[in-house]
Amino acid sequence: TSGPSLNETNYQAWKIQRQLINVWLDDLKWPELKNWNCSQKTWNEGPFGREKDFYGKNNENRNSMTTDGSARIFESLMTNEIIPKGENEHLKQLFHRSLDPVSRKKDLENQVDGFLGEGLPFSSKLWSKAGLMSEVRHDVAWWKAPNKNPMLAVVFTTGKELVKDQFLLPA
């Protein structure tokens, strides 16, 4: 959990726990995940305490992912490759996005508007995970239109101007 900086013994134990996700990803032995780091929480205002310590003085331990790796992970989740079907339905629900305009208006952080799903027909089904922070606008989207095969798209952008561009990804 987050909190103030820790003494060295507790900090080392905390780091081991935080790195477990990276150990699991490494154990998959997928080339798309080489050099990935998914051990950091995301922050609106920046990390503090032990989280800031863990990022490193120059943020050298920040999260680092790729579009290829994100595509592989998301497809594997959606096709039940890495988590058996009965066990990942809850996870899929977390990624499910409503395309209904009324529902989207009620949720300003809906991860559809300003992202890949915004341009889809309302009859489609969408599962996605957007990332929007001060310098990145990312999206991983899996959708299925009626009577069509599922589609997957992954877009990562970097730059303060692109972060503000609400029309870049839905285009």
Per-region residue spans from a language model:
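Active-site-adjacent helix/loop patches that line small-molecule binding or acyl-intermediate pockets
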Residues: 1-71, 76
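Structured C-terminal helix/loop/strand segments within mature extracytoplasmic catalytic/sensor domains
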Residues: 62-67, 71-171
